[in-house]
């Protein structure tokens, strides 16, 4: 079994659980934690099985397991700190999903994935803010006004984490 086969199996498992979480986050701003935790267990078990079955070197297996543990712990800490410093702008589901993503990516790629997720989230937020401002100007010129005043809008972050993870895994 080649590295490409490992990568394909891991990616299919990751996306099987990530895409419904993305959909739920976009539609309801809720992340199904049971589904994410089930994905975490399935992906971890698949990685353990594949690494144990096909790695000839026991030290490689140990190194890979240590990499997964460090990746999960670092991801939990990173997303928790973002949650604290953003005054709850990031939900608990995003933290759990970040840990799930860390198991998929590994330590180094997870850091790259988090950077890609943050960058794509910021770009989306800026584009949405510009679109909102343009819409407001068009309504003002036509004599209409928005009846509902909305504060700063909330963006679902799980799709950006997923995008960043897949991009990081396939680029690095």
Place the predicted regions along the sequence by residue.
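A membrane-topology feature that recognizes alpha-helical transmembrane segments
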Residues: 1-172
